């Protein structure tokens, strides 16, 4: 597994940047830049850089966007390019680039402190990885942002929405009469914590699961994942690595005959959560136990469910 040292260095510097904005905290994990008393009407959810905002991270903010829309705010999303379809399909206004003149408040993650520290707009930075969070992440963001904005306490849906009209024209490799396990053994942000031992555990598990269920295995991943991986996977029935887009992955995971997921804790896992399907997860870990405990308790999944054993089992 290739380790992105530059990415990890940026994450370390970001932790230092957070220390310098602690004085502007409005909650244990939320910080406000450029506080003013102007009436807030338009809100931008800003996270356009993949290195700082992976695909799965986008999903955590959709329930907040949904809640703000319901509260009468004009919501715009600035996601990474490959996630624009997700928000557009759900009816949100998507902003690829440009000025912020028509925006009253920017909401983003602390990972974007450097990008926005010179902004003249009000910016609400959220530390979504804080072990101080004591609720499921989607619920927590809605509750705290709602309190900041002085919104009335109305009901909300903390489960990220799933687009309806995704299309399966790029999934012609599927046999709709068969049942499938989706398998992904790649990680981005956790690569420094994942090695050959973890790969063996994951591969041994899915081999046994395939025999036990009789399901076919679809191997997913990017073009880069496939190019950097010389292993031969004799248990894989369909190698879809590099053959599908992020949108296609959403479509794949939504199908009725795609029943199980085996992966690290990433996008694929969260898509299965959203469809109330079972994932077998090899946790990529965290350096500190309190951070690992937080992720397992409040991010996997990021919303409350009373049937957690039906959607996740750790390997």
Residue ranges and their predicted role:
Residues 42-47, 176-192:
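Conserved donor-binding/catalytic core segment of Leloir-type glycosyltransferases
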């Amino acid at each position: 597994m290739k380790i992105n040292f530059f990415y990890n260095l940026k994450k370390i510097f970001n932790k230092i940047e957070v220390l310098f904005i602690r004085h502007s905290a409005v909650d244990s994990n939320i910080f406000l830049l450029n506080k003013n008393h102007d009436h807030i009407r338009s809100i931008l959810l800003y996270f356009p850089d993949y290195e700082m905002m992976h695909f799965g991270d986008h999903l955590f903010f959709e329930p907040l966007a949904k809640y703000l829309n319901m509260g009468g705010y004009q919501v715009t999303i600035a996601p990474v390019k490959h996630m624009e379809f997700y928000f557009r399909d759900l009816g949100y206004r998507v902003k690829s680039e440009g000025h912020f003149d028509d925006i009253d408040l920017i909401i983003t993650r602390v990972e974007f402190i450097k990008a926005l520290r010179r902004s003249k707009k009000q910016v609400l930075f959220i530390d979504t990885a804080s072990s101080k969070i004591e609720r499921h992440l989607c619920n927590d963001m809605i509750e705290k942002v709602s309190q900041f904005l002085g919104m009335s306490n109305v009901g909300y849906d903390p489960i990220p929405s799933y687009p309806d009209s995704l299309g399966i024209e790029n999934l012609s490799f599927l046999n709709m009469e068969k049942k499938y396990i989706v398998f992904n053994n790649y990680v981005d942000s956790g690569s420094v914590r994942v090695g050959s031992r973890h790969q063996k555990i994951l591969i041994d598990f899915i081999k046994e699961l395939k025999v036990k269920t009789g399901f076919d295995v679809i191997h997913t991943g990017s073009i880069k994942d496939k190019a950097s991986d010389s292993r031969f996977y004799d248990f894989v029935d369909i190698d879809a690595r590099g053959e599908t887009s992020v949108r296609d992955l959403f479509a794949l995971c939504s199908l009725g005959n795609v029943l199980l997921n085996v992966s690290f804790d990433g996008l694929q896992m969260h898509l299965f959560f959203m469809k109330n399907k079972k994932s077998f997860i090899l946790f990529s870990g965290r350096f500190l136990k309190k951070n690992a405990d937080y992720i397992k308790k409040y991010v996997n999944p990021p919303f409350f469910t009373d049937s957690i054993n039906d959607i996740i089992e750790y390997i």
